[in-house]
Curated annotation (Swiss-Prot):
Originating organism: Pseudomonas aeruginosa (strain UCBPP-PA14)
Protein name, as recorded: Siroheme synthase
Location of region: Uroporphyrinogen-III C-methyltransferase: 217-465
EC number annotated for this UniProt entry: 2.1.1.107, 1.3.1.76, 4.99.1.4
PANTHER family per UniProt: SIROHEME SYNTHASE, SIROHEME SYNTHASE-RELATED
Length: 465
């Protein structure tokens, strides 16, 4: 290890930046974020750098660097393209014992800047010791996606209660166990779900009760998207990997299910039109029962749980019973499948609105507001419309839509098995029979479908028609 990782307090201390360009500006911003008072020396100073220094009450010295600029500084940055000058700044700083960083010159540095993931007060630094800064930045980019932005709030909560916990738990090992449980439990989850006030209230109650606690479960209603695992949200993935029990249905792709916690109990509650492995009311009760046992329950649903996913029915029961829950939206099939098929749902020349329609109603019929559905300038997207497709096409034409209106079938959209068939309202049912199209299949009706020939970019493993 060539450099020892340390975090340096610069609050209210003087930091010298030699240089006035964009590189100097980037370094100065970091110093200002850390609370440093800036002294910038350069014959010409970038306008944004000038404003940054003035806002922080620092010093602007618009002239050449002088050796007398260094005394009293806690840190020195050389950010010029003048190599002899950078070397001079480094030599003088080392002679005075002042930490110095020379941009893009590791050999002249006594300190180096890492790639930073800032979730203040939680900060993660990644460094290659100056050997591969681009690699360090790539690793930082990965960490940015893995560490929720709300982790800073979680660290702040812990800071505010640190002394009280220490008084209640003087034993170091007991405190360690307490914090480990807190950071992996319901209080932390409230913070990460954007409910910090609720988290603080729960922690207050726990401390007031002498730390005695009965675990309370929670339900995560998570949208798994249309099929491609890369379309999962960060929050969805985090909750999938911490749930104790997973309830999933047939629209959840196996590749997505595999991303759930390995040792989580999995319960299939798959639903198909008019066929239910587990009736909806039983699913609702099961969510309540499992959460009441103190378990973290993941209800994983294809697409978005609030768009033809019956998510509202499931959390209605939870709300009535006082069971904590959170909802994580997913990319709905209309958006995901249309994008992967190269069919924009709206377009200035073809469609100024889009309508999502269920292909069958609660009683199994296809009794829809047909007159509204034939209005011009709109795209129709039918969910669960395969069985009722002949009726849908017939009724749209009967109510005034042209039989030659472009239409598309997207089977298993966004996955490697995606198949797309385009035609018209007149021949769409025939395409289903000819190509043995099966669920899950999305139906899109509208002039935008004709853009697929030009905009298609994703091809599944099977040929389209």
């Amino acid at each position: 290890m060539d450099f020892l990782p340390l975090f340096h307090s610069l609050q209210g201390r003087l930091a010298l930046v030699v240089g006035g360009g964009e590189v100097a500006l980037r370094k100065a911003r970091l110093l200002a974020d850390a609370g440093a008072r800036l002294r910038v020396v350069a014959p010409q100073i970038h306008i944004e750098l000038r404003h940054l220094v003035e806002q922080g009450g620092g010093e602007l010295l618009e002239r050449d660097y002088q050796d007398g600029d260094q005394p009293g500084c806690a840190l020195i940055i050389a950010a010029t393209d003048d190599e002899p000058l950078n070397a001079e700044v480094s030599r003088a700083a080392n002679a005075r014992g002042i930490p110095v960083n020379v941009v893009d010159a590791p050999a002249l540095c006594s300190v180096i800047f890492p790639a930073i993931v800032d979730r203040s007060p939680l900060v993660v630094a990644v460094s290659s010791g100056g050997d591969a800064p681009v690699l360090a930045r790539l690793i930082r980019a990965k960490l940015e996606t893995w560490i929720p932005s709300t982790y800073g709030q979680l660290a702040g909560l812990a800071s505010r209660f640190r002394h009280r916990v220490k008084e209640l738990l003087p034993d170091l090992q007991q405190r360690r166990v307490f914090w480990e449980n807190l950071f992996q439990g319901e209080i932390a989850e409230r913070v990460l779900a954007g409910r910090p006030a609720e988290a603080e209230r729960l922690l207050e109650e726990r401390l007031a009760g002498g730390l005695a606690h009965i675990a309370t479960g929670e339900v995560y209603l998570v949208g798994a998207g249309p099929g491609d695992p890369d379309l999962l949200t960060f929050r969805a993935l985090r909750l999938m990997q911490q749930a104790d029990v997973v309830l999933y249905d047939r629209l959840v792709a196996p590749s997505i299910l595999e991303l759930c916690r390995r040792d989580a109990e999995r319960l299939y509650v798959g639903k198909r039109r008019a066929e239910h492995a587990v009736p909806q009311d039983r699913i609702n009760r099961l969510l309540v029962e499992l959460a009441s046992q103190g378990k973290r329950v993941l209800r994983l649903k294809g697409g978005d749980p609030f768009i033809f996913g019956r998510g509202g029915e499931e959390i209605d029961e939870l709300a009535a019973r006082g069971i904590p829950f959170q909802v994580v939206p997913g990319i709905t099939a209309a958006s995901g499948c249309a994008a992967y098929a190269g069919i924009p749902l709206t377009h200035r020349d073809h469609a100024q609105s889009v309508r999502f329609v269920t292909g069958h109603l609660k009683d199994g019929t296809t009794d829809l507001p047909w007159q509204d559905l034939v209005a011009p300038g709109q795209t129709l997207v039918f969910y669960m419309g395969l069985v009722g497709l002949p009726v849908i096409c017939e009724q749209l034409v009967a109510h005034g839509r042209s039989a030659q209106t472009p239409a598309a079938l997207i089977q298993q959209g966004t996955t490697a098995q995606q198949r797309v068939f385009t035609g018209t309202l007149e021949n769409l049912p025939q395409l289903v029979a000819e190509h043995e199209v099966h669920a899950p299949t999305l139906v899109i009706v509208g002039e935008v479908v004709q853009l697929r020939d030009k905009l298609a970019w994703f091809e599944g493993a099977r040929e389209d028609a």
